[in-house]
Amino acid sequence: MDAREMKIKAAAAALAHVEDGMRLGIGTGSTAEEFVRLLAEKVASGFKVEGVPTSERTARLCVELGVPLKSLDELPALDLTIDGADEVDPALRLIKGGGGALLREKIVAAASERMIVIADESKLVDTLGAYALPIEVNPFGLVSTRIAIEKVAARLGLAGELSLRQSGDGEFTTDGGHHIIDASFGRIPDAEALSSELNSIPGVVEHGLFINMAALAIIAGPAGARTLQANR
């Protein structure tokens, strides 16, 4: 079973949690896109949902495939969000934001009664940090914000390269007009402390640590999909 087949397995297992008539947050990334494709097949057969996308990219795919969409202002309270992750630990703490949509992903997840994470088994880790942590920052005062992040890292005993994410024509810009600093800290032993410290920096708009947000993780491997509950 290749990586895409595992993503499809996880997406299919998550779809079983979606009930007719739900208000649904729809994530961003390759695994979430497999979920959208499967959801669209159910919608075409008469299944009713209203979706809130977490990125313009997801919105375009939903429109293309016929998944009905609303804005979060139109549906401010959601029943369920299905989204992928770059890393998942045993407590269902997550690193997200590889696709650049972490701010909207976190807003939508926070507006949901439940969040289910879908991923292939390569994303399951004992401790977060092998994947670079995306930190969304305001373009104004970028150097000062970067220095503040470095100071936070030093206080917590973390070190590593901070790189401004690039796209084909310069700095990557999020749907909200911000930039992303990818922080390669390596192992993050205290994700809660790092989250709190990053939240205190004025130039940090949001970061990719999702803590106490996911209710379930559906992890797919060669033997199929398994469901994990938070070990908190």
From Swiss-Prot:
Query: Which pathway does the protein contribute to?
Result: Carbohydrate degradation; pentose phosphate pathway; D-ribose 5-phosphate from D-ribulose 5-phosphate (non-oxidative stage): step 1/1
Gene Ontology biological-process entries: pentose-phosphate shunt, non-oxidative branch
For the protein in the UniProt heading, the enzyme class is isomerase
The protein's Enzyme Commission number: 5.3.1.6
Please list the residues that bind substrate.
28-31, 83-86, 96-99, 123
**Record flagged with keyword Cytoplasm:** no
Q: Which UniProt keywords apply?
A: Isomerase
Q: Where is the active site?
A: 105 (proton acceptor)
Question: SUPFAM superfamilies from the xrefs?
Answer: D-ribose-5-phosphate isomerase (RpiA), lid domain, NagB/RpiA/CoA transferase-like
**Gene3D superfamilies given for it?**
3.30.70.260, 3.40.50.1360
This chain's function reads: Catalyzes the reversible conversion of ribose-5-phosphate to ribulose 5-phosphate.
What is said about its interaction partners and assembly? Homodimer.
Q: Which HAMAP family match?
A: Rib_5P_isom_A
Q: What family is this?
A: Belongs to the ribose 5-phosphate isomerase family.
Q: What is this protein called?
A: Ribose-5-phosphate isomerase A
| Organism of origin | Rhizobium leguminosarum bv. trifolii (strain WSM2304)
